[in-house]
């Protein structure tokens, strides 16, 4: 019994030391090309990362168009997003980002087996953001502390997508229309910068019509 307790204590100590180390060094999510066979075979998902590290930006950004030109040699035009979990260890992923002048957006889509679950439970980071919208983004090697607000008005999402409906439907073998993909957009607000405060006030005006 004593040996078991000792083994458990050693295991706990190793886990704690590992987490403390990763808290300092960070652990980024791996990048897999969405167009690759590897991504398709993995169920269109990859292993998440943990903490993101880098210089934190405290200055307000008034024009986000530059994010559309991000072209990382590995991650291409994607960025990393760190979300808060209920158990305290971050969950970070690779996502798409869109800048439209002074407005910033992130987007994500669900298809195949993910459509079997109600939003936001088909993706872990969606669930995390729904519970706590405070996130950290790594763009160009720097950390931006943000607040995400889901755009619930599908007409507004269609406008952001240049007129494309966020709900994609196709006719199946049974001759009936079936939903094959649903795309969601979030408005992104900076927080923890002197001009904007913590970002909570900026999130208030967003529309709340049904998704």
Task: Label each region the model flagged.
Residues 1-17:
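N-terminal Sec-pathway targeting helices
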Residues 2-5, 25-26, 30, 206:
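Membrane-anchoring alpha-helices and their flanking helix-loop junctions
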Residues 14-33:
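Membrane-interface motif at the C-terminal end of an N-terminal transmembrane signal
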Residues 27-90:
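Short, conserved active-site entrance elements at the starts or edges of catalytic domains
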Residues 38-50, 54-57, 111-205:
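Short, structured beta-strand-loop surface elements
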Residues 73, 89-91, 98-99, 130, ...:
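Extracellular/periplasmic catalytic domains that process cell-envelope and extracellular macromolecules
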Residues 76-118, 146:
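Short beta-strand segments
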Residues 208-211:
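Short, solvent-exposed mixed-charge patches
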């Amino acid at each position: 019994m004593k040996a078991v307790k000792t083994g458990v204590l050693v295991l706990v100590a190793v886990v704690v030391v590992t987490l403390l180390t990763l808290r300092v060094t960070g652990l980024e999510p791996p990048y897999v090309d969405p167009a690759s066979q590897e991504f398709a075979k993995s169920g269109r998902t990859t292993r998440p990362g943990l903490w993101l590290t880098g210089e934190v930006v405290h200055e307000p950004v008034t024009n986000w168009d530059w994010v559309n030109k991000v072209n990382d040699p590995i991650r291409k035009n994607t960025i990393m997003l760190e979300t808060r979990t209920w158990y305290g260890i971050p969950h970070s992923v690779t996502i798409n980002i869109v800048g439209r002048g002074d407005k910033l957006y992130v987007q994500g889509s669900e298809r195949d087996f993910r459509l079997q679950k109600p939003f936001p439970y088909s993706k872990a980071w969606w669930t995390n953001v729904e519970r706590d919208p405070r996130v950290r983004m790594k763009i160009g090697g720097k950390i931006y502390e943000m607040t995400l607000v889901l755009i619930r008005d599908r007409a507004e999402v269609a406008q952001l997508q240049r007129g494309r409906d966020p709900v994609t439907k196709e006719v199946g073998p049974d001759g009936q229309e079936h939903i094959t993909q649903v795309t969601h957009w979030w408005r992104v607000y900076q927080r923890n910068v002197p001009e904007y405060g913590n970002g909570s006030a900026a999130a208030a005006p967003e529309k709340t019509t049904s998704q």
